[in-house]
């Protein structure tokens, strides 16, 4: 049963958030890095959900106490309806410019090329992009920026304020612990998956440049 639903876009500290939530909740948190271990099941399941097919979220997310990052964050509204007692955490960068640079330095690299271009994986990536950014082309900075701001406003409009936590990694444990009613752990807040660290993992990224394990 999910206790935390992530609504933040990729490259907004989602790997950091995953680690923090796993510490707080004592259970796994779904993230794009998990999908790489579930390539036979997750891409088809999330693609079917994006197409409007009936989705068994309990089965897809069995064993997880939280779900952040794509693909799950693209379905934050559906998940919030399915799990009404869960809080929704929208992780953010400090500006569109820093987010755009981080994405272009990492997960956008080669996203539209490679042998994954026609696979279920590629179809899943395209589907979650469309759910998040509509018809904005990934190469059109202005269109993506407009869609980026619309996305955040849509989350604020659809998630009740009492359930929504807007989170930046610099905030540390406080906002998460307050929202979950949990004590602050006696350990430093994790800070993971910088652009440099992402590039150290590029050997793990499949052809096509889709987000790899740790793709925050």
Question: Could you tell me what each predicted segment is?
Answer:
Residues 1-62:
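PAPS-dependent sulfotransferase catalytic core
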Residues 41-56, 104-119, 133-137, 198-216:
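Ligand-binding grooves and catalytic loops that recognize ribose/phosphate and carbohydrate rings
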Residues 63-64, 86:
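Short, well-ordered alpha-helix to beta-strand connector turns
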Residues 25-29, 34-37, 48-61, 74, 76-166, 179-182:
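PAPS-dependent sulfotransferase catalytic domain
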Residues 34-43, 89-96, 114-116, 150-212:
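The conserved 3'-phosphoadenosine-5'-phosphosulfate
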Residues 6-8, 28-32, 68-69, 87-92, ...:
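A structural signal for short, well-ordered beta-strand segments and their strand-loop junctions
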């Amino acid at each position: 049963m999910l206790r935390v639903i992530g609504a933040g876009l990729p490259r907004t500290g989602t790997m950091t958030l995953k680690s923090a939530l796993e510490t707080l909740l004592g259970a796994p948190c779904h993230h794009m890095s998990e999908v790489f271990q579930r390539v036979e099941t997750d891409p088809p399941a999330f693609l079917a959900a994006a197409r409007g097919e009936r989705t068994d979220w309990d089965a897809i997310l069995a064993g997880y106490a939280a779900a952040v990052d794509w693909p799950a964050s693209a379905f934050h509204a559906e998940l919030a309806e399915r799990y009404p007692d869960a809080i929704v955490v929208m992780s953010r960068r400090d500006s569109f410019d820093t987010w755009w640079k981080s994405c272009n330095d990492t997960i956008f690299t080669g996203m539209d090329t490679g042998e994954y271009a026609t696979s279920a994986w590629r179809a899943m990536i395209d589907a979650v992009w469309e759910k998040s950014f509509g018809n904005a082309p990934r190469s059109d900075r202005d269109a993506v920026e407009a869609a980026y701001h619309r996305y955040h406003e849509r989350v604020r409009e659809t998630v009740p304020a009492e359930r929504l936590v807007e989170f930046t990694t610099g905030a540390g444990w406080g906002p998460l612990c307050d929202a979950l009613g949990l004590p602050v752990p006696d350990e430093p807040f994790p800070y993971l998956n910088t652009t440099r660290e992402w590039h150290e993992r590029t050997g793990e990224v499949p052809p096509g440049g889709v987000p790899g394990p740790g793709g925050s």
